[in-house]
Amino acid sequence: MRVYQFCRPFQLFTCFLCYLLVFVKANKEKISQKNYQVCAGMYSKEDWKGKIDPFISFNLKKISGLSDESDPGLVVAIYDFQDFEHLGVQLPDEEMYYICDDYAIDIGICEEENRDEFIVQDVVYDPYTSTNRSLANPIMTFSQNEVGLHDTRYPIKETGFYCVTAFRSSTSTKFNAVVNFRNAYGQLAGTEINKLPLYGLLAVAYVVAMALYSFAFWKHKHELLPLQKYLLAFFVFLTAETIFVWAYYDLKNEKGDTAGIKVYMVFLSILTAGKVTFSFFLLLIIALGYGIVYPKLNKTLMRRCQMYGALTYAICIGFLIQSYLTDMEAPSPLILITLIPMALALIIFYYMIIRSMTKTVIYLKEQRQIVKLNMYKKLLYIIYASFLSVLAGSIVSSFIYVGMNTIDMIEKNWRSRFFVTDFWPTLVYFIVFVTIAFLWRPTDTSYMLAASQQLPTDPENVADFDLGDLQSFDDQDDASIITGERGIDEDDLNLNFTDDEEGHDNVNNHSQGHGPVSPSPTK
C-alpha cells in the first residue's frame, strides 16, 4: 500500500513550519519514519570560504519492512526550501500527489523515467506573490531501498535554507538515515558559524574589561571592599567562561559532534548554570546593601543567600543534565520535574532582588544619603534597561520580517535568528555586568563612602556631623569596620527578607561627636 501519495496543500508546508523550531544545530541530523523532514541553513563557498565544496549527502543506516524486491523503499528529495511548492502536483479534486508511480504515470502527471521519484514542476503559481515562479535551485530526487551512502551528493551553489524529505513507499517500512549538511568551512551548522568570530570578539572584550578593572583593583588594593573582591572573582569566571564557549565552537567546527564535544557541552552548561546563579546572588547581596550601605551583612542572612544560591545552582544543573538525557525527537513531560523548580527558583530570586533593592532605595531616601541613593538608582535603571534591551531585540527582529512573505522570512531568518535568541542576550549581559562593575569599581573614595556617614542634606542637622569624622579612621579602624571585629552589635546587622529584620531601622541617623564612626550599618 502506497502512503504519503496524497496530501493537502498546506500539510507539507505546516511540517516545515514545525521544523523551524527544531532545525539542525549540527551538521548531521537523523531522520526516520516518524521524523522524515529536516532543514538547515547552508553557505556557498563564495559566501564563506573553506577547504571543500559544500554539499548535502544522504546515508541510509537501517531499513526494514519492504514489501518485495521491487519496493523502492524510500523516495527522497533534496531541495532549496523556497522551491518546496514545486514538489507534487495538484489533482482535479484539489489533493496533492507527490510520488511518480504507476497511477501518476497513467494519468500523465509524470514520465516513466521519473518512476519512484518526487514529482517536480519547473514552474508553479506562487500564492504569496500571485505570480508564476520558477525553480531557484535544482531539486535532487531519488529512491533507495538498500543500506548505505547514496552515491550522489547535492552540491550547494548558492547560500540558502535547504531541506531533505524522505517518504516511505509502504506503511510497514521503517528506516533510519543520517543527512549530512556539510559546509565549506568545517563541521559547524550554518546557524552556528557566526557565533565563532562573535564569541571570540566577546572574549577579547571581557579580557580588556577585566584588565581595566584589575588595574583599579591593584591600584586601590589597600582600600578594597569585599563586594569589589566578589566582582573581580566573577570577572575572572566570566572571562574564562566566554573563552571556553569560543573554544567549544572552534573545536566543534574542527572535530564535529563527537562524544568528547558532547561532554564539553555538558561542562559548558555547568558553567552557564554557575553564571546565571551567581549573577542573581551578586545582585541580591548588592540589593541588600552589601559593601555600600553596610560594611557586611549579618552572618545568618549571608548564609541564607549562599544556601539559596547553591540550591538554585543544583536545580539548574539537574535541569541541564535531564535535558541532555532527554530524546529531543520524543520529548517527555518528565522534563517538567526540573524545569518548573528552576523557573520558580529564578522567579523567587528576581522577586527578592527587586524587593530588597526597593527597600534599600527607600531607606537611603529617608536617610537622605544622596550619593548612595544615586548609585542604587543607577543600578535599578541598569536592570530595567537590560530587560528592555532584550525585549527590544525581539521586537525589532519581528518588525524586520513583517514586510516579508513566509518563504522569504524562513529563507533569511536562519542567518540572524541566533543573534536574537543567543548572542544578543549574552551581549546585553556583558554590557550590564561591565557597567555594574564600573559603578562599584575601587576608587579613592569608594571605601570611605562605604565606611562613613554622609553629610545630611537637612540644614538643621549639618552641625551634627563634621567632615573630620571621615579623616579620623586609622588603618586599624578601617580593618575593624570591614571585618566586623570591633564593636559590632548583632542586632544592628540583623538583616533578613522580612520587614522587621531588614535592618534599616537600626541605623543611627546622626554620628555622635567627632570620633570614629560606629560599625553599625552605614548610610
From Swiss-Prot:
Annotated family: Belongs to the LU7TM family.
A GO CC annotation given for this chain: membrane
InterPro entries per the UniProt record, alphabetical: GOST_TM, GPR107/GPR108-like, PTM1-like_N
Residues annotated as signal peptide: 1-26
Region (Disordered): 483-523
Membrane topology reported for the UniProt record: Multi-pass membrane protein
Sugar attachment sites: N132
Protein name (record): Membrane protein PTM1
Subcellular location field: Golgi apparatus membrane; Early endosome membrane
BP terms from Gene Ontology: retrograde transport, endosome to Golgi
TM region positions: 198-218, 231-251, 266-286, 305-325, 334-354, 382-402, 418-438
Keywords: Endosome, Glycoprotein, Golgi apparatus, Membrane, Phosphoprotein, Signal, Transmembrane, Transmembrane helix
Entry coiled-coil feature ranges: none
Phosphoserine, modified sites: S480
Gene name, Swiss-Prot/TrEMBL: PTM1
Domain of life of the organism encoding this protein: Eukaryota
Modified residue annotations for Phosphothreonine: T483, T498
Residue stretches of biased makeup (Acidic residues): 488-503
One Pfam entry name: PTM1-like_N
Residue spans, topological domain Cytoplasmic: 219-230, 287-304, 355-381, 439-523
Residues in the Lumenal compartment per record: 27-197, 252-265, 326-333, 403-417
